[in-house]
Amino acid sequence: MALSSESTAYGTSSLSTDERLSSRSGAQRKWIKWGGFGAGIIAVGLIVLKTSSVSASTSSTVATATSDEGDVTCFQSSFVNNVTNMMAPIKGLKWTLGGEKKTKSFISIDVDTQFQEIIGFGGAFTEAASLQFNRLPKHKQEEVLTLYFDKEQGSAYDFGRVPMGSCDFSVASYNFAETVDDIDLVNFDVNVTHDTETIIPFLKRALERKPDLKLFLAPWSPPAWMKRSSSEYTASMLGSVKPVGLRDDMRASWALYFSKFITAYKKHGISFWGLTPQNEPEFAAPWEACAYTPEYQAEFIGEYLGPVLERDHPGLTLMVYDHNRNNIQHWAKVIYGHPTASKYVHGMAFHWYEDGADRYMDGVEYPEHLNETHYIDPNRFILASESCNCPGVAFGKDAWFRAQRYGHDIMSDLNNHVAGWVDWNLLLDHTGGPNHKNNLCDAPIILTENGDDFQIQPMYYFIQHFSKFIPIGSRRVHVKVAAHFTKPGDPQLYLNYQTSLATCDGSSRQALHKTNDNKMQVTNTPFCLNMVPLSEGQEIRLVECQWTQQTWTFEETTQRIRLDDKCLSLNDKSTMNGVRVTVDKCEADVKPHQQWTFKDEDGTMRSQASTENQCVTAGYSFVQASAFVTPDNHKVLVVMNENTEAAEFQVQVGDAVLDTEVLPGAIQTYVW
């Protein structure tokens, strides 16, 4: 069964159920999910939203609150009892000045403690996205442009990412310097002919709507003749030799290629704001790829790319890395500290994927690496440059899960000094393509099979809860989240989840106990805390208790929990909310960050280092929040509740309080 061809409307989403696709995706996702939603995509009788076509001139369902509706404008997107309600206004919210402040369930905001400045949100103009845009009738193209770039009726995107040459989301591999060993690029296609048929027309239409759209480019691969071969690999745009794919003698030519590409786009009236030297430099992908080490990329920037850009295109913003969170801090240390590259680099770009893990882990791993990267050089920014849900196009509860993952990822990034967030494909076809290596994925807008209309996925609205209300120049401000649930809810745990220390909230993720065979189990689930080895050190992951033979020693006199010479610890000895629980070598002197207690009265596990009400949490806290002050001094609070129970809490700002709640699995944005 194909995607429904029913017309689209702003304020709706596609949550139709396709049992064939559900079955296929369930088979592809080999993971364990413990909880009420079950495993994989569950094909249930969902309400299929049938709405009339809405032209670009029609008002959005996102209303503007008037003075008699309350002091606070609020919008909520929810999926309860198989019914979606997207960007629904919650009216009548009013502050109580001097009201009694709750101490058990609250979110407090300190607008005077400010952090990074926001530089924007956006998506990618891939060839796949451009081809789908071109398939749509003109009036539907206008709707897409409104949905993404209009401030009043859309998501107010600020950024566009543009592949330099082909990527996996192209129909086939291509580049603009096909002549082998043309080191001076005399035969470079200065018209960038291939892109004039796809990407450039889409960009021009977007720029008509958003003239100040910030575009940044990223290459997936140089032409094959610029790349290294080996005994096991013949140079091609696909794949790469590791650890370095670019030939030493082609670095000057490759740097010149960047300059000529930027110049060619300028001749079409399209200017770039910035670039990265390479997409995912640590991954020798089966599609277009070129591996780099941080040291080699630093040398390429310092000796070749940086000087060429400074000469030909001064003022461009250069970001490095453009890969997963796992190693971002290492790349920042190397390149920021490099004697020639450092002066050309403005910041770091990164992706949401988790190296080598199942895709349900994307967006939840290693947020502390972003925090560490910020403090390596607080004067340089961090940009989330790619996120994408795979495999295929999701429906039903799995589509909502993917939207929640986006919301969680954006929230986690922003709370760890990230200045902006950019999605991957702006739109794709009904299969999640085209992709010439069959790496099919989801997108916020999915075309119907016949290509005359589109469906809006829930993730579109989760992005909009941030992008629409947090303009460029906004500042993140301090938030303390101390929500508390009256019912614990479904733990919704996954194999290999990490474990953290967070404010005690009464949820099922914070119920842990010591078993009779000396394991640490999440109560009423099959999961235990398990030590796993890394290339350097170890960490704690969730595993099914029946599959681990680890038995921990619980030292009554020291309150340490040890396995051989390793003790359960807090990462970096920190008690910051959300800090990871890990393992380190047991210290000679017993320290609080390696001391733990189990509280029988509430079934929780605590750290002796914490001076606040914090509990060991399997995964992460269900309630997350970020707050901002905009350039016109509006305040914005985004709250997401991933529990299966509603979150009731009090918002506290100065001497003003507001009692409110977020529905199960929902996201809200407050503006005042």
Predicted features and spans:
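Lectin-like carbohydrate-binding module/patch detector with strong preference for beta-trefoil
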Residues: 476, 481-619
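Short, low-complexity, Lys/Arg-enriched N-terminal segments of secretory-pathway carbohydrate enzymes
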Residues: 1-28
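Substrate-binding and catalytic surfaces of secreted/luminal carbohydrate-active proteins
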Residues: 65-109, 215-217, 256-273, 284-490, ...
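N-terminal signal-anchor transmembrane helix specifying type II single-pass membrane topology
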Residues: 22-56
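N-terminal catalytic cores of secreted or lumenal carbohydrate-active enzymes
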Residues: 84-272, 293, 303
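Short acidic/His/Gly/Ser-rich catalytic and metal-binding motifs that mark active-site loops
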Residues: 169-173, 223-237, 281-286, 328-330, ...
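Short, solvent-exposed turn/loop segments enriched in Gly/Ser/Thr/Pro and often Arg
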Residues: 161-168, 219-222, 276-279, 322-325, ...
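Ser/Thr/Pro/Gly-rich low-complexity linker/stalk segments immediately outside membranes or between
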Residues: 53-67
